[in-house]
């Protein structure tokens, strides 16, 4: 019977060692998963910062070009207004004279379709 109890005792010890090894492997696996998760988070943060930097750079280029465009449009508008004011001042006198002469200087004429009934 002692040999049987020794065999059972050896089996229990082997089972305990296997259980300890499994627990140790689970702990190592958990530690590796935690480390991998931390590394992934660091990598994600770095990637996010890189993409944010690229986005801000592109945004500043676009916004800068929009500011340049708005300044250019403002300059063109002011130039056009000055040009129109110049034309107004230049031609105002002659246009008013033509308009007044058309209204005031009437030349009475008989219409071409008028027929004398006499």
UniProtKB/Swiss-Prot annotation:
Function, in words: Subunit of the V1 complex of vacuolar(H+)-ATPase (V-ATPase), a multisubunit enzyme composed of a peripheral complex (V1) that hydrolyzes ATP and a membrane integral complex (V0) that translocates protons. V-ATPase is responsible for acidifying and maintaining the pH of intracellular compartments and in some cell types, is targeted to the plasma membrane, where it is responsible for acidifying the extracellular environment.
Family: Belongs to the V-ATPase G subunit family.
Chain spans, region Disordered: 1-34
Domain of life the protein comes from: Eukaryota
GO molecular function: ATP hydrolysis activity; ATPase binding; proton-transporting ATPase activity, rotational mechanism
Subunit structure: V-ATPase is a heteromultimeric enzyme made up of two complexes: the ATP-hydrolytic V1 complex and the proton translocation V0 complex. The V1 complex consists of three catalytic AB heterodimers that form a heterohexamer, three peripheral stalks each consisting of EG heterodimers, one central rotor including subunits D and F, and the regulatory subunits C and H. The proton translocation complex V0 consists of the proton transport subunit a, a ring of proteolipid subunits c9c'', rotary subunit d, subunits e and f, and the accessory subunits ATP6AP1/Ac45 and ATP6AP2/PRR.
Entry keywords, A to Z: Coiled coil, Hydrogen ion transport, Ion transport, Transport
Matching InterPro entries: V-ATPase_G
Transmembrane residue ranges: none
The protein, known as: V-type proton ATPase subunit G 3
Pfam families referenced in this protein's UniProt entry, alphabetically: V-ATPase_G
Any one Gene Ontology BP term: synaptic vesicle lumen acidification
This protein's encoding gene: ATP6V1G3
GO CC annotation terms, alphabetical: cytosol; plasma membrane; synaptic vesicle membrane; vacuolar proton-transporting V-type ATPase, V1 domain
Coiled coil: 5-54
Biased composition (Basic and acidic residues): 14-26
């Amino acid at each position: 019977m002692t040999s049987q109890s020794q065999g059972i005792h050896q089996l229990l010890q082997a089972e305990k060692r296997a259980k300890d090894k499994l627990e140790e492997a689970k702990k190592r696996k958990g530690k590796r998963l935690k480390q991998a998760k931390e590394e992934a988070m660091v990598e994600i943060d770095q990637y996010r910062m890189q993409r944010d930097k690229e986005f801000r750079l592109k945004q500043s280029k676009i916004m800068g070009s929009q500011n340049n465009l708005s300044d250019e449009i403002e300059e063109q508008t002011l130039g056009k207004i000055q040009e129109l004011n110049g034309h107004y001042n230049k031609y105002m006198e002659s246009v008013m004279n033509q308009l007044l002469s058309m209204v005031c200087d009437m030349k009475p004429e008989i219409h071409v379709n008028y027929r004398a009934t006499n």
